Structure formats: structure tokens, C-alpha cells
């Protein structure tokens, strides 16, 4: 069986959306004749936005997982380790002077991101695995986009290796990029990294056709080496979940919420809904105080439940046991590039969905 080295920062016990894609690929790759070899960061050194220890149980039996230390650059500009940013943390920026300084430091002194503190450790271990395991194919998946620089360096050392760069999100075009206050020099450096990765990778994977077009427009003659492999869902995640008898009409949102997510139209709609029927509203995921205040101002706080974080299986259970699922996309000029993974799980359940962007009609 051919071996493929998968270099990924997010791996169980990391929680959140970023871990799901390659956890599932690693499960199914052996069916296609590929043995995955995982290289990831040791959780003791990692800066994860969330922990989901239940995902450890989903690891394929006998899978080879190699972990290395990392330098935790987040400690340098964040005194509160409990508030480790997720990939989209700037979507809910702290507008205090301290928050703005923190984001400026992040955007101009840690390019492309602070998780690059893992790179030197990962590179050394990757070289060891490539040589000992006779690996000729590697995959780097991002965000964090600093992981792609590991592949860039490996390709330089081993020109004959096949390097596949999996880009789940935009890089310098991500909707919250400007909230790091990057200088012209910082933008140039970061864009340079992005173009080098796009140019030197043997194949590029994106999660959607619009994202493919975005990357294809960065350089001439790279379109033909960009493939689209969408996210999906695993039927096994649903087989042991039995829908319960609902006591009333339940609306559920699962995932991140921030001030960039347009809730006004939805809250206006449920204000009208309250006049004609009883209902309950449930948010499962991280949310700032401002969201709570917005809901309180709408008069809906008596019927709302906030669950700060739930393991993946529990989050799916909340979705299954709902009357209506809410899907919200952040307000941004390029939000068409946002392909939320939860939409695949929503589709798998064939439940009614209320979608909000700027306005919601129910």
C-alpha cells in the first residue's frame, strides 16, 4: 500500500471544524490503496481554539500518528491562553486599544500566522519520516497557512516528491484579513508566500469552485493543477443518534457566532413568530457577550439556550433533535467563498433550514 504523509496542525484532541476534513480522509484513504501517516503538533504545545477529546475515539485503528513540540507564539501577544484564536477569530475583534495592538502584532510580526512556531519541528520530523518510510507523496492542509510553508521547504529539499497543498480557506483574501492591520510590507510578504505555494505545489486542492477560481487567478497556468474536493459528511456519525420527541418548535444554530454574523433579520423574524406560536432557540458554539446582548434586546432571551461548546457527536445530536436549523454566513464582500462544513451535516438530515446573509425571510 502506498504511503502518504499528511501534515496537519489540527488533529484530535483538537476540536472545531478544521480537524474534520482530514480525520475523515484518513479513515477512508486505505479503501483507495493509501496508508496515511499523520504528522501533527503535540497537544501539550498546541494552540487549539477548542478541545474535543471524543474525536480521539474516531481515529482509525493502527493509524500512524507522529507528534512534535512547537513554539507557542500566542503566549507572546496574548496573556490569556484560554482565548486562543480560531481561524476566524478576527471576525469578532476586540476593539479596545489592547485588542487592536494584539491584532497588529499578529498581522505584522507573525506571518503568515503565529502557529508557524510548529514549522521547524514539523520539518525535521517530516524529513525523518520521508527517508525512513520511503514516502513520495505529502499533503499539507491549511489553515493555519503556515503549514503550507512546511511543504514548500520539503519540496525544495526533495524535488522529486509529490506535494499536494490542501487549502480549505482563502489565504490573503480571507474576509477578516484587514483586521490584522497588515502593512504594505506584511501584505507583500504574505502574498509572496501564497504565490510560492501555489506555484511549487504539484497539485492544489480547494473545497469549492469559487475558491479554485480565486487561487487560479493568482498566477498564470496553474488552473489545471487545482482540484476541487468538497467537504462532506460521514454517515457513521449519525447511525447511533435517535431523534427524540420534541416538546415544542426548536430552532438550532451550531457553530461560531460573532458580530460579523447578521442576526438582525433573524431576530426580527422570530419576534413575529412569537406572536403566532411557541418556540425555543438554541445556540451551540462559541459566542461573544455582544450576541447575548443583541438577543436580550430583541426580547427573545427567555426562550434561548446557549451551549458554549459541545463535542462533535453531541453537536450532531442537537441538530438532529431540532425542528429548524439556522445557517448564518458572515457579512463580508467575499462571503461566497465561505463553505461552511456544517451545511453538509445539515443536508444529511434533510431538515428545514433558515439561511441568513443580510436578511432572513421565514
Which residues are covered by each model-predicted region?
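A conserved catalytic-core segment of Leloir-type glycosyltransferases
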Residues: 41-120, 129
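Carbohydrate-associated surface elements
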Residues: 210, 229-232
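Conserved donor-binding/catalytic core segment of Leloir-type glycosyltransferases
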Residues: 244-261, 267-268
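Nucleotide-sugar-dependent
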Residues: 261, 311-318, 325-347, 352-362
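Nucleotide-activated donor-binding/catalytic signature segment of Leloir-type glycosyltransferases, i.e.
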Residues: 285, 290-316
Amino acid at each position: 500500500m502506498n504511503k502518504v504523509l499528511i501534515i496537519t496542525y489540527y488533529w484530535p484532541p483538537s476540536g472545531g471544524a478544521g480537524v474534520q476534513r482530514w480525520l475523515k480522509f484518513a479513515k477512508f484513504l486505505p479503501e483507495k490503496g493509501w496508508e496515511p501517516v499523520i504528522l501533527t503538533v503535540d497537544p501539550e504545545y498546541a494552540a487549539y481554539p477548542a478541545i474535543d477529546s471524543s474525536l480521539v475515539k474516531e481515529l482509525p485503528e493502527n493509524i500512524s500518528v507522529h507528534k512534535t513540540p512547537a513554539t507557542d507564539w500566542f503566549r507572546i501577544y496574548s496573556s490569556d491562553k484560554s482565548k486562543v484564536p480560531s481561524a476566524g477569530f478576527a471576525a469578532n475583534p476586540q476593539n479596545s486599544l489592547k485588542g487592536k495592538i494584539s491584532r497588529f502584532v499578529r498581522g505584522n510580526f507573525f506571518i503568515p500566522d503565529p502557529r508557524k512556531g510548529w514549522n521547524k519541528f514539523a520539518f525535521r520530523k517530516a524529513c525523518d519520516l520521508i527517508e525512513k518510510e520511503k514516502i513520495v507523496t505529502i499533503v499539507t492542509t491549511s489553515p493555519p497557512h503556515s503549514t503550507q510553508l512546511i511543504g514548500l521547504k520539503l519540496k525544495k529539499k526533495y524535488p522529486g516528491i509529490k506535494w499536494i497543498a490542501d487549502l480549505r480557506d482563502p489565504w490573503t483574501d480571507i474576509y477578516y484579513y484587514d483586521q490584522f492591520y497588515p502593512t504594505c510590507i506584511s501584505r507583500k510578504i504574505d502574498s509572496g508566500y501564497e504565490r510560492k505555494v501555489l506555484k511549487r505545489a504539484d497539485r492544489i486542492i480547494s473545497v469549492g469552485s469559487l475558491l479554485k477560481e480565486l487561487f487560479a487567478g493568482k498566477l498564470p497556468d496553474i488552473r489545471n493543477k487545482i482540484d476541487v474536493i468538497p467537504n462532506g459528511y460521514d454517515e457513521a456519525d449519525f447511525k447511533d443518534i435517535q431523534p427524540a420527541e420534541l416538546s415544542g418548535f426548536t430552532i438550532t444554530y451550531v457553530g461560531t457566532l460573532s458580530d460579523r454574523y447578521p442576526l438582525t433579520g433573524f431576530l426580527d423574524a422570530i419576534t413575529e413568530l412569537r406572536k403566532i406560536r411557541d418556540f425555543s432557540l438554541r445556540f451551540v458554539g462559541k459566542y461573544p457577550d455582544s450576541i447575548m446582548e443583541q438577543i436580550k434586546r430583541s426580547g427573545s432571551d427567555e426562550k434561548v439556550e446557549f451551549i458554549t461548546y459541545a463535542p462533535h457527536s453531541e453537536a450532531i445530536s442537537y441538530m438532529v433533535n431540532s425542528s429548524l436549523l439556522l445557517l448564518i454566513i458572515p457579512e463580508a464582500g467575499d462571503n461566497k467563498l465561505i463553505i461552511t462544513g456544517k451545511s453538509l451535516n445539515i443536508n444529511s438530515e434533510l431538515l428545514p433550514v433558515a439561511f441568513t446573509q443580510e436578511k432572513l425571510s421565514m
